[in-house]
């Protein structure tokens, strides 16, 4: 079972909220959310495979989205959590939406920051560049370059620095495994866009998230169960750039009927 942390609800609520980080991060990126949300919900933080305090998989193990989602479900089962709200950032947003399609009975509401629904030409070029250089360059150079392209502005300095710092804790082999997983991402994203689910989804996107915000706007215009809040002066990692706004908007959504 993946490494995970539980913070019981201070109001004795039976409701759960599960936070899923992105590639290269770990559950420490939710430090601004834990104290706030444990007032209202039981909080579950998960470290994905090879991230944070979760174990590295044996040599030769290849990842698929279904394997990673099963990891998350195993944590829920271990703690007898039948249903939970889910909150994800970046790659975590893809995992949660993929899980919703296959296991909608485990999901209440969804809040997504830095949500990835498609890849624009710049992000596709980045993916190709990473693929061509991952066997030549230290992965942290590639990751750092990605971080500066995705989060380029001064307002993103804190989130950019945290992600680079946490990514340094991942092994090179683990980075390559997750990178190979992203090669399968386009058909997964197409299915997410094409198949609207009834579960309420709130996208909380930074106004500077230029690579991914346009696609979210398009989907919200088409999917009736989805809504969007754009947070000013914030980039891809909106929960770190503007934590108070992120928390208050997400809480209002989760508590609404």
Language-model segments: which ranges?
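Catalytic histidine-centered segment of alpha/beta-hydrolase-like enzymes
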Residues: 234-247
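Flexible "cap/lid" loop of the alpha/beta hydrolase fold
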Residues: 97, 101-102, 107-137
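Active-site loop/oxyanion-hole signature of alpha/beta-hydrolase fold enzymes
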Residues: 35, 44-87, 91, 248
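Conserved HGGG/HGGXW glycine-rich cap/lid loop of the alpha/beta-hydrolase fold
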Residues: 5-56
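Conserved alpha/beta-hydrolase catalytic His-Asp/Glu region
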Residues: 121-123, 140-195
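Conserved alpha/beta-hydrolase "acid-adjacent" motif
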Residues: 210-216
């Amino acid at each position: 079972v993946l490494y995970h942390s539980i913070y019981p609800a201070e109001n004795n609520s039976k409701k759960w909220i599960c936070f899923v980080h992105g590639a290269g991060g770990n559950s420490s990126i939710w430090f601004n959310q834990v104290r706030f949300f444990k007032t209202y919900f039981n909080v579950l933080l998960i470290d994905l495979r090879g991230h944070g305090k979760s174990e590295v998989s044996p040599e030769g193990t290849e990842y698929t989205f279904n394997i990673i989602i099963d990891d998350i479900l195993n944590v829920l089962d271990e703690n007898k959590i039948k249903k939970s709200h889910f909150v994800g950032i970046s790659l975590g947003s893809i995992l949660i939406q993929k899980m919703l399609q296959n296991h909608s009975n485990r999901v209440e509401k969804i809040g997504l920051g830095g949500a990835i629904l498609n890849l624009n030409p710049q992000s596709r070029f980045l993916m190709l560049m990473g693929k061509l250089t991952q066997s030549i360059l230290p992965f942290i150079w590639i990751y750092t370059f990605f971080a500066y392209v995705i989060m380029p502005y001064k307002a993103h300095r804190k989130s950019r620095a945290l992600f680079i710092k946490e990514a340094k804790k991942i092994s090179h082999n683990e980075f390559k495994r997750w990178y190979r997983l992203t090669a399968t991402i386009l058909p997964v994203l197409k299915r997410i866009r094409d198949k609207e689910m009834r579960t309420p989804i709130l996208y909380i996107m930074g106004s500077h998230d230029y690579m991914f915000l346009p696609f979210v706007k398009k989907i919200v215009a088409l999917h009736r169960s989805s809504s969007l809040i754009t947070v000013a002066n914030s980039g891809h990692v909106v929960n770190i750039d503007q934590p108070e706004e992120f928390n208050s908007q997400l809480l209002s959504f989760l508590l609404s009927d």
